[in-house]
């Protein structure tokens, strides 16, 4: 019998917002769909997207991704206007929208986009409920990371000697 070839699953992440992990404490992570136009999907497939300064707002009980820059391709049709920074609607359940709007309003959280990824043929957004870090928090994080790297180096040296 012929065996089916097992294919390696490639990373489906399109772009990761590393700045968000540096500037915010991420409390909880959510996934949502995006309402996109055809030219936006083509631009995302070619990698012309930037989410480093993007955030999520609540407008009339609907969530929108703001300040996400999707550059239009040169070969796009001129029949319609391409607004690179338009608000993109997030597809979330009603209870998720209520939970997020309550957290944002009462406790001072913000919603920051973390990454864009493909799920089958759909483009999805991963965003987090976050609180801002102070300069002191950032320094503490940096010291922890440096100490972890130093520990790994020490362990590596001790393994080589034995």
Swiss-Prot record:
SUPFAM superfamilies: Small protein B (SmpB) (SSF74982). InterPro entries: SmpB, SsrA-bd_prot, SsrA-bd_prot_CS. Its main location: cytoplasm. This is SsrA-binding protein. Belongs to the SmpB family. It comes from Buchnera aphidicola subsp. Acyrthosiphon pisum (strain APS) (Acyrthosiphon pisum symbiotic bacterium). GO terms for biological process: trans-translation. One of its GO terms (cellular component) is cytosol. It is found in: Cytoplasm. Required for rescue of stalled ribosomes mediated by trans-translation. Binds to transfer-messenger RNA (tmRNA), required for stable association of tmRNA with ribosomes. tmRNA and SmpB together mimic tRNA shape, replacing the anticodon stem-loop with SmpB. tmRNA is encoded by the ssrA gene; the 2 termini fold to resemble tRNA(Ala) and it encodes a 'tag peptide', a short internal open reading frame. During trans-translation Ala-aminoacylated tmRNA acts like a tRNA, entering the A-site of stalled ribosomes, displacing the stalled mRNA. The keyword RNA-binding applies. Gene3D superfamilies: 2.40.280.10. Keywords: Cytoplasm, RNA-binding. GO terms for molecular function: RNA binding. It comes from the Bacteria. Pfam families: SmpB (PF01668). The keyword RNA-binding applies.
